[in-house]
Amino acid sequence: SLHRPPGCRHCVGQLRLCDLDTADAVEEMGAEHVPCPVDDIVVDEDNKVVTTPAYMLAQNIAEAASGIEKLVARVLVLTA
C-alpha cells in the first residue's frame, strides 16, 4: 500500500473523468485530491511529492508521456 503524508496534495485525474472512488479514498486517508488533466502534474512542494494522472486517464502512451515527462523534470528539480 502507498503511504502519503497527511495533507499531501496529489491527483488521480480530472473530477469528471477520474475514478471518484479513488479520489474519495485518497481524501479519506488525509490527502488532498487536486483535479488535473492527463498531460499535467500536481506538485506538493512541502512534502516533495509530484503526481500525474498518467495511466488513470490516458487513452494511449502518447497522452500519458507528456505528464510523465513533466513529472520527471520536476522531481529532478526537487532533488537538486
From Swiss-Prot:
EC number(s) given by UniProt: 4.2.1.-
Gene3D superfamilies hit by this protein: 3.40.50.880
Keywords for the protein's UniProt record, in alphabetical order: Lyase
Name of the top EC class for this enzyme: lyase
GO molecular function, one term: lyase activity
Domain of life of the native organism: Bacteria
Keyword Nucleotidyltransferase among UniProt keywords: no
Recorded catalytic activity of this chain's protein: glyoxal + H2O = glycolate + H(+)
Family: Belongs to the peptidase C56 family.
Protein purpose: Displays glyoxalase activity, catalyzing the conversion of glyoxal to glycolate. However, this apparent glyoxalase activity may reflect a deglycase activity, which could be the primary function of this protein like other DJ-1 superfamily members such as PARK7, YajL, YhbO and HchA. Is not able to use methylglyoxal as substrate.
Complex formation: Homodimer.
Protein name: Putative glyoxalase ElbB
Organism in which the protein naturally occurs: Klebsiella oxytoca
Lineage: Bacteria, Pseudomonadati, Pseudomonadota, Gammaproteobacteria, Enterobacterales
Gene name linked to the record: elbB
